């Protein structure tokens, strides 16, 4: 490890810490390993892949003290833990959105709207809020609070605030459906197997506000669907699980809540036809449609997706009203979705 780099830093906007901004701290940590332009990435080059590059990987802890950090954050160095004072008072926020004009393709597009980008492995956040404040999906389009592209990522007691596409759990699918649909930092990077763990978090949005191809385990989280005055106000998840990947999204002991009228939101729909989303012991509020899940008009998804529930409770939890392609798990089948199995991969990862 570079002797000039401490193992811990404090970040405080009042100048009492080592840095005044998270951007400043990350730029200092990353400057010796990555080109300066990468610290402000719109598009990361295909090579090197920063997630697996060499350089300093000694664990570093950043204490992020209370404040509204109106910064665009890019994390490229592995082994960083960022601990906020409190998610109510420690906020990383931005306001970029997909319909913003851009010279190259005419608009910013989904994947250049992030307030925070993680393109590294072994990153942990605790007690921090990620926010995109740009507006509701029908008005501004997609707007990411967090673009999470890495393996062994942990988020504990965090909030994710936004509207359409609040949280992107990379990787991207192999191919675009629309031209220039993937323009952004991950477009040219190899698609990597990412495992994420979200514990005691609050996530909100309207359309597809948790989406992507990662294997992600959500435990004791609240998933809040926001009212946008539409017949369908919200789709909570839009997984794009790669074909052959054993796990997609697993929600355990989570609460699906919202301020939408009864039966005006869905638990999820398949961004790609091999999507996997499993609910274990979750509370399903009245705002969720009785059928629970939507097929996004993909007939092949009836055969290829996995949408499954075990011991759901709440007003919209009746499995008898779900479509035939939604599975009700037995206790033996539900045991396949314990955290230690879902996240273990080839290295036995099992975050506490």
What is the predicted role of each segment?
Residues 2-352:
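Sequence-level preference for short, compositionally simple segments enriched
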């Amino acid at each position: 490890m570079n002797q000039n780099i401490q193992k811990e830093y404090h970040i405080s906007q009042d100048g009492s810490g080592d840095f005044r901004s998270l951007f400043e701290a990350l730029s200092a940590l990353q400057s010796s390993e990555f080109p300066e332009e990468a610290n402000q990435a719109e598009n990361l080059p295909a090579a090197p892949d920063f997630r697996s590059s060499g350089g300093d990987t000694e664990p570093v802890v950043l204490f992020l003290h209370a404040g509204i950090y109106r910064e665009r954050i890019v994390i490229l160095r592995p082994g960083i833990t960022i601990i906020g004072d409190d998610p109510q008072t420690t906020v990383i926020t931005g306001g970029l959105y997909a319909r913003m004009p851009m010279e190259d393709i005419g608009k910013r597009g989904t994947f250049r709207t992030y307030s925070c980008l993680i393109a590294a492995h072994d990153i942990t956040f605790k007690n921090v809020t990620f926010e995109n404040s740009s507006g509701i999906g029908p008005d501004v389009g997609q707007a990411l609070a967090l673009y999470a592209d890495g393996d062994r990522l942990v988020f504990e007691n965090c909030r994710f605030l936004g509207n359409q596409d609040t949280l992107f759990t990379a990787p991207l699918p192999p191919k675009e459906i629309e031209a220039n649909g993937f323009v952004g930092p991950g477009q040219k990077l190899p698609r990597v197997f990412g495992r994420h763990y979200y514990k005691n978090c609050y996530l909100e949005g309207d359309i597809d506000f948790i989406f992507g191809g990662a294997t992600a385990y959500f435990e004791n989280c609240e998933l809040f669907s926001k009212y946008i005055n539409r017949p369908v106000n919200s789709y909570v998840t839009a997984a794009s699980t790669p074909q052959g990947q054993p796990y997609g999204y697993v929600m355990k002991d989570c609460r699906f809540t919202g301020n939408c009228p009864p039966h005006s939101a869905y638990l999820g729909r398949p961004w790609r036809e091999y999507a996997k989303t499993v609910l274990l012991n979750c509370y399903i509020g009245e705002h969720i449609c009785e059928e629970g899940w939507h097929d996004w008009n993909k007939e092949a998804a009836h055969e290829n997706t996995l949408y499954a529930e075990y011991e759901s409770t709440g007003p919209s939890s009746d499995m008898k009203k779900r479509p035939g392609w939604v599975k009700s798990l037995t206790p033996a089948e539900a045991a396949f979705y314990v955290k230690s199995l879902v996240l273990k991969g080839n290295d036995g990862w099992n975050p506490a």
